[in-house]
Protein backbone atom coordinates (compact mmCIF):
# COMPACT_ATOMS: atom_id res chain seq x y z
CA UNK A 1 0.00 0.00 0.00
CA UNK A 2 1.34 3.42 -0.97
CA UNK A 3 1.85 5.81 1.91
CA UNK A 4 2.73 9.41 2.66
CA UNK A 5 4.78 10.74 5.55
CA UNK A 6 5.42 14.19 6.97
CA UNK A 7 8.86 15.37 8.03
CA UNK A 8 9.74 18.48 10.04
CA UNK A 9 13.47 18.99 9.58
CA UNK A 10 14.38 21.35 12.40
CA UNK A 11 17.67 22.87 13.43
CA UNK A 12 18.30 20.24 16.09
CA UNK A 13 15.72 17.49 15.65
CA UNK A 14 13.98 15.99 12.65
CA UNK A 15 10.46 14.80 13.45
CA UNK A 16 8.61 12.26 11.33
CA UNK A 17 4.83 11.69 11.36
CA UNK A 18 3.23 8.72 9.63
CA UNK A 19 0.40 6.22 9.88
CA UNK A 20 1.49 2.83 11.24
CA UNK A 21 0.13 -0.57 10.20
CA UNK A 22 -2.90 -0.03 12.44
CA UNK A 23 -3.51 3.30 10.67
CA UNK A 24 -2.67 5.16 13.87
CA UNK A 25 -0.62 8.35 13.96
CA UNK A 26 2.95 7.53 14.96
CA UNK A 27 6.19 9.49 15.33
CA UNK A 28 9.94 9.17 15.07
CA UNK A 29 12.66 11.61 16.10
CA UNK A 30 16.22 11.78 14.84
CA UNK A 31 18.95 14.36 15.41
CA UNK A 32 19.07 16.50 12.28
CA UNK A 33 22.83 16.06 11.90
CA UNK A 34 22.32 12.28 11.65
CA UNK A 35 20.78 12.30 8.20
CA UNK A 36 21.98 8.76 7.50
CA UNK A 37 19.61 7.54 10.22
CA UNK A 38 16.70 9.33 8.54
CA UNK A 39 17.54 7.69 5.22
CA UNK A 40 17.93 4.26 6.85
CA UNK A 41 14.56 4.60 8.59
CA UNK A 42 12.86 5.51 5.31
CA UNK A 43 14.46 2.55 3.55
CA UNK A 44 13.05 0.21 6.19
CA UNK A 45 9.50 1.42 5.55
CA UNK A 46 7.53 -0.16 2.73
CA UNK A 47 5.41 1.67 0.20
CA UNK A 48 6.48 5.26 0.84
CA UNK A 49 5.85 7.20 -2.34
CA UNK A 50 5.44 10.78 -1.14
CA UNK A 51 7.09 12.85 1.56
CA UNK A 52 6.03 16.31 2.65
CA UNK A 53 8.96 18.18 4.17
CA UNK A 54 8.92 21.34 6.24
CA UNK A 55 11.33 23.08 8.61
CA UNK A 56 14.60 24.98 8.44
CA UNK A 57 16.55 22.07 6.98
CA UNK A 58 13.85 21.07 4.48
CA UNK A 59 15.88 22.07 1.40
CA UNK A 60 18.91 20.15 2.59
CA UNK A 61 16.89 17.00 3.26
CA UNK A 62 14.96 17.37 0.01
CA UNK A 63 18.20 17.20 -1.97
CA UNK A 64 19.02 13.86 -0.35
CA UNK A 65 15.60 12.30 -0.90
CA UNK A 66 14.28 13.73 -4.17
CA UNK A 67 15.81 10.96 -6.32
CA UNK A 68 13.92 8.25 -4.42
CA UNK A 69 10.64 9.89 -3.41
CA UNK A 70 8.11 12.42 -4.60
CA UNK A 71 8.76 15.47 -2.43
CA UNK A 72 6.26 18.16 -1.45
CA UNK A 73 7.60 21.17 0.44
CA UNK A 74 5.47 23.20 2.85
CA UNK A 75 6.12 26.49 4.63
CA UNK A 76 7.24 25.77 8.18
CA UNK A 77 4.61 27.77 9.99
CA UNK A 78 1.76 26.71 7.75
CA UNK A 79 2.65 23.12 8.61
CA UNK A 80 2.85 23.92 12.31
CA UNK A 81 -0.52 25.66 12.33
CA UNK A 82 -2.21 22.76 10.51
CA UNK A 83 -0.73 20.41 13.09
CA UNK A 84 -1.73 22.58 16.04
CA UNK A 85 -5.29 22.91 14.75
CA UNK A 86 -5.48 19.12 14.40
CA UNK A 87 -4.23 18.53 17.96
CA UNK A 88 -6.53 21.21 19.42
CA UNK A 89 -9.52 19.50 17.83
CA UNK A 90 -8.33 16.08 18.95
CA UNK A 91 -7.90 17.31 22.54
CA UNK A 92 -11.29 19.05 22.39
CA UNK A 93 -10.08 22.62 22.79
CA UNK A 94 -12.33 25.30 21.31
CA UNK A 95 -9.89 28.18 20.90
CA UNK A 96 -9.66 30.39 17.83
CA UNK A 97 -7.49 33.28 18.99
CA UNK A 98 -4.24 32.64 20.83
CA UNK A 99 -0.53 33.28 21.01
CA UNK A 100 1.48 30.32 19.75
CA UNK A 101 4.98 29.98 21.17
CA UNK A 102 7.14 27.37 19.48
CA UNK A 103 10.22 26.50 21.54
CA UNK A 104 12.61 24.77 19.20
CA UNK A 105 16.32 25.47 18.81
CA UNK A 106 15.28 29.10 19.14
CA UNK A 107 11.78 30.39 19.85
CA UNK A 108 9.22 31.83 17.43
CA UNK A 109 5.98 33.49 18.52
CA UNK A 110 2.86 34.06 16.42
CA UNK A 111 -0.58 35.57 16.83
CA UNK A 112 -3.32 33.25 15.62
CA UNK A 113 -6.70 34.67 14.59
CA UNK A 114 -8.96 31.90 13.35
CA UNK A 115 -7.15 30.66 10.20
CA UNK A 116 -4.83 33.64 9.93
CA UNK A 117 -1.46 34.08 11.58
CA UNK A 118 0.95 36.95 12.09
CA UNK A 119 4.51 36.58 13.29
CA UNK A 120 4.81 38.54 16.51
CA UNK A 121 8.51 37.98 17.05
CA UNK A 122 10.89 35.56 18.64
CA UNK A 123 14.17 35.09 20.44
CA UNK A 124 17.37 33.14 20.04
CA UNK A 125 16.75 31.77 23.53
CA UNK A 126 15.30 28.27 23.29
CA UNK A 127 16.22 24.61 23.29
CA UNK A 128 19.56 25.35 21.66
CA UNK A 129 20.36 27.65 24.57
CA UNK A 130 19.57 24.90 27.06
CA UNK A 131 21.83 22.44 25.29
CA UNK A 132 24.60 24.95 24.58
CA UNK A 133 24.83 26.17 28.17
CA UNK A 134 24.45 22.63 29.50
CA UNK A 135 27.48 21.57 27.45
CA UNK A 136 29.52 24.62 28.44
CA UNK A 137 28.72 24.50 32.16
CA UNK A 138 28.30 20.78 32.90
CA UNK A 139 29.72 19.02 29.81
CA UNK A 140 26.36 17.26 29.32
CA UNK A 141 25.31 17.42 25.69
CA UNK A 142 22.32 15.09 25.32
CA UNK A 143 18.80 16.28 26.05
CA UNK A 144 17.88 12.84 27.38
CA UNK A 145 20.55 13.24 30.09
CA UNK A 146 19.60 16.82 30.96
CA UNK A 147 15.96 16.07 31.84
CA UNK A 148 16.39 13.61 34.77
CA UNK A 149 19.14 15.72 36.34
CA UNK A 150 17.03 18.86 36.05
CA UNK A 151 14.21 17.18 37.97
CA UNK A 152 16.37 16.87 41.11
CA UNK A 153 18.04 20.28 40.76
CA UNK A 154 17.31 23.51 42.61
CA UNK A 155 17.68 27.13 41.55
CA UNK A 156 17.86 28.53 45.10
CA UNK A 157 21.65 28.66 45.29
CA UNK A 158 22.12 30.29 41.89
CA UNK A 159 19.21 32.66 41.18
CA UNK A 160 18.70 35.92 43.04
CA UNK A 161 15.03 36.41 43.90
CA UNK A 162 13.16 39.59 44.72
CA UNK A 163 13.02 38.36 48.32
CA UNK A 164 16.82 38.05 48.42
CA UNK A 165 17.16 41.69 47.44
CA UNK A 166 14.56 43.08 49.83
CA UNK A 167 15.74 40.89 52.71
CA UNK A 168 12.43 40.50 54.49
CA UNK A 169 11.23 44.04 53.82
CA UNK A 170 7.88 44.30 52.07
CA UNK A 171 8.58 44.30 48.33
CA UNK A 172 6.35 45.79 45.60
CA UNK A 173 6.19 42.43 43.77
CA UNK A 174 6.15 38.75 44.70
CA UNK A 175 9.27 37.77 46.67
CA UNK A 176 9.56 34.47 44.79
CA UNK A 177 10.06 36.12 41.39
CA UNK A 178 13.51 35.94 39.85
CA UNK A 179 15.47 39.18 40.04
CA UNK A 180 18.58 37.77 38.37
CA UNK A 181 19.13 34.39 36.73
CA UNK A 182 22.48 32.96 37.91
CA UNK A 183 23.03 36.17 39.90
CA UNK A 184 24.33 34.40 43.03
CA UNK A 185 27.14 32.76 41.05
CA UNK A 186 28.88 36.15 40.87
CA UNK A 187 28.72 36.85 44.61
CA UNK A 188 29.41 33.44 46.17
CA UNK A 189 32.30 30.96 45.97
CA UNK A 190 30.21 27.79 46.13
CA UNK A 191 30.81 24.78 43.92
CA UNK A 192 27.53 24.04 42.19
CA UNK A 193 26.40 20.58 41.20
CA UNK A 194 25.26 19.76 37.68
CA UNK A 195 21.62 19.29 38.67
CA UNK A 196 21.35 22.79 40.12
CA UNK A 197 23.09 24.34 37.13
CA UNK A 198 20.82 22.53 34.68
CA UNK A 199 17.69 23.51 36.62
CA UNK A 200 18.84 27.14 36.60
CA UNK A 201 19.54 27.09 32.86
CA UNK A 202 16.00 25.90 32.25
CA UNK A 203 14.72 28.60 34.58
CA UNK A 204 16.46 31.27 32.55
CA UNK A 205 15.14 29.95 29.24
CA UNK A 206 11.62 29.38 30.57
CA UNK A 207 11.34 32.86 32.07
CA UNK A 208 12.71 34.66 29.01
CA UNK A 209 10.40 32.80 26.63
CA UNK A 210 7.37 33.26 28.89
CA UNK A 211 8.03 36.96 29.52
CA UNK A 212 8.18 37.62 25.79
CA UNK A 213 5.04 35.56 25.13
CA UNK A 214 3.17 37.41 27.86
CA UNK A 215 4.13 40.80 26.42
CA UNK A 216 2.74 39.84 23.03
CA UNK A 217 -0.42 38.38 24.57
CA UNK A 218 -0.99 41.49 26.66
CA UNK A 219 -0.48 43.81 23.68
CA UNK A 220 -3.32 42.13 21.77
CA UNK A 221 -5.43 41.33 24.85
CA UNK A 222 -5.22 37.58 24.20
CA UNK A 223 -5.93 35.20 27.08
CA UNK A 224 -4.47 31.88 25.88
CA UNK A 225 -0.86 31.06 25.14
CA UNK A 226 -0.15 27.69 23.55
CA UNK A 227 3.40 26.45 24.11
CA UNK A 228 4.76 23.79 21.76
CA UNK A 229 8.13 22.44 20.67
CA UNK A 230 10.37 19.45 21.24
CA UNK A 231 12.11 21.29 24.08
CA UNK A 232 8.97 20.74 26.18
CA UNK A 233 8.77 16.99 25.50
CA UNK A 234 8.90 15.13 28.85
CA UNK A 235 10.31 18.34 30.32
CA UNK A 236 8.03 18.84 33.31
CA UNK A 237 10.46 21.23 34.99
CA UNK A 238 10.34 23.68 32.08
CA UNK A 239 6.58 23.27 31.70
CA UNK A 240 6.08 24.11 35.38
CA UNK A 241 8.22 27.25 35.12
CA UNK A 242 6.32 28.45 32.06
CA UNK A 243 2.93 27.52 33.49
CA UNK A 244 3.37 29.23 36.86
CA UNK A 245 4.73 32.43 35.33
CA UNK A 246 1.95 32.56 32.72
CA UNK A 247 -0.75 32.03 35.35
CA UNK A 248 0.86 34.64 37.61
CA UNK A 249 0.19 37.17 34.83
CA UNK A 250 -3.44 36.01 34.54
CA UNK A 251 -3.03 34.24 31.21
CA UNK A 252 -3.89 30.62 30.44
CA UNK A 253 -1.00 28.33 29.40
CA UNK A 254 -1.77 25.31 27.23
CA UNK A 255 0.64 22.45 26.54
CA UNK A 256 -0.44 20.12 23.77
CA UNK A 257 0.32 16.43 23.79
CA UNK A 258 2.49 15.80 20.72
CA UNK A 259 2.86 19.56 20.32
CA UNK A 260 6.51 19.02 19.45
CA UNK A 261 5.36 17.07 16.41
CA UNK A 262 3.00 19.78 15.13
CA UNK A 263 5.06 20.55 12.06
CA UNK A 264 5.42 16.91 11.03
CA UNK A 265 1.71 16.29 11.64
CA UNK A 266 0.80 19.33 9.55
CA UNK A 267 3.08 18.19 6.74
CA UNK A 268 1.50 14.73 6.77
CA UNK A 269 -2.04 16.11 6.73
CA UNK A 270 -1.25 18.62 3.99
CA UNK A 271 0.26 15.99 1.70
CA UNK A 272 -2.48 13.47 2.43
CA UNK A 273 -5.25 15.96 1.66
CA UNK A 274 -3.46 17.18 -1.46
CA UNK A 275 -3.01 13.60 -2.65
CA UNK A 276 -6.67 12.74 -2.10
From Swiss-Prot:
Tell me which UniProt keywords the record has, alphabetically. Answer: ATP-binding, Coenzyme A biosynthesis, Cytoplasm, Kinase, Nucleotide-binding, Transferase
Protein residues bound to ATP? 8-15, 105, 127-131, 143, 230
Please name the GO terms of the biological process aspect recorded for this protein, alphabetically. Answer: coenzyme A biosynthetic process
E.C. number: 2.7.1.33
Which superkingdom, per the lineage? Bacteria
Q: Which InterPro entries match?
A: ATPase_NBD, Type_II_PanK, Type_II_PanK_bac
User: Subcellular location, in the record's words?
Assistant: Cytoplasm
The UniProt family comment states:
Belongs to the type II pantothenate kinase family.
> What PANTHER family does the record tag this protein with?
4'-PHOSPHOPANTETHEINE PHOSPHATASE (PTHR12280:SF20), PANTOTHENATE KINASE (PTHR12280)
Output this protein's name: Type II pantothenate kinase
Q: Which gene encodes it?
A: coaW
